[in-house]
């Protein structure tokens, strides 16, 4: 049962449907090397509450968090992830 994921540096892409349907996943911390998050990457993760997205991320598919309504994005102010959160009405916290 995957509850928390902390990625090591070196990971650059979170692929399509990578964590789709992980229904107990609560927290994800992406590596500082991640650049993109694919379609449905975190789809149907109802317990996902926190995802830490670094400034290095410059692409997030519009459906990356589809049907994961409880997620809050933690990201630096002015980052692409912040803009994505605002545009998609996803709660976010600057850090």
Where in this protein do the model-derived segments appear?
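Structural signature of tandem-repeat unit edges
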Residues: 1-13, 23-36, 45-59, 68-83, ...
């Amino acid at each position: 049962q995957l509850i928390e994921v902390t990625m090591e540096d070196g990971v650059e892409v979170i692929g399509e449907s990578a964590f789709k349907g992980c229904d107990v996943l609560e927290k994800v911390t992406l590596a500082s090397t991640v650049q993109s998050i694919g379609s449905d990457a975190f789809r149907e993760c109802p317990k996902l509450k926190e995802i830490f997205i670094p400034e290095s991320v410059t692409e997030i598919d519009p459906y990356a968090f589809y049907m994961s309504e409880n997620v809050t994005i933690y990201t630096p102010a002015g980052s692409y992830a912040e803009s994505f959160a605002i545009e998609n009405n996803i709660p976010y916290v600057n850090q």
